[in-house]
UniProtKB/Swiss-Prot annotation:
Function: Transfers the 4'-phosphopantetheine moiety from coenzyme A to a Ser of acyl-carrier-protein.
Name of the gene: acpS
Name by which UniProt lists this protein: Holo-[acyl-carrier-protein] synthase
Record-listed E.C. numbers: 2.7.8.7
Lineage: Bacteria, Pseudomonadati, Campylobacterota, Epsilonproteobacteria, Campylobacterales
Keyword Magnesium applies: yes
One GO CC annotation: cytoplasm
Gene Ontology molecular function terms on file: holo-[acyl-carrier-protein] synthase activity; magnesium ion binding
Localization of this protein: Cytoplasm
């Protein structure tokens, strides 16, 4: 399955300026917050988590929350994605890939998920 999301970076900027790190804690773990350098990075992480939930076919909600999805960086700085064991098991996730890009005022993310005879997908 494939999921895609786009967010206007200034929208994330306004959210973070208004609510600060408290807002980031709603959708990012402490480790993820440490990776966020600016509004652009936060926007990419938001888009990645939204795209992942869409690839699972459920969106962000009761079945898959923001904290079930973790964004981390590889040794060469590329973004990677990891799912909680609950999500891996429930959706029979075999593999997952992430791409994040920024263009002008937008952050865009695409997530692909391969699963075995999934319950949900």
């Amino acid at each position: 399955m494939i999921g895609i999301d786009i967010i206007k970076i200034s929208r994330m900027g306004a959210l973070l300026e208004r609510f600060g790190s408290k807002a980031m804690g709603r959708f990012l773990s402490k480790d993820e917050i440490e990776l966020v350098k600016n509004h652009k990075t936060a926007s990419g992480f938001w888009a990645a988590k939204e795209a992942c939930s869409k690839a699972l076919g459920v969106g962000i909600g009761a079945e898959c929350g923001f904290h079930d999805i973790t964004i981390f960086k590889s040794s060469n700085g590329a973004p990677n994605i990891r799912l909680s064991q609950k999500i891996v098991k429930e959706f029979n996730v075999k593999s997952i890939s992430l791409s994040i890009t920024h263009d002008g005022e937008y952050a865009i993310a695409v997530v692909t998920i391969e699963s075995t005879a999934a319950n949900k997908i």
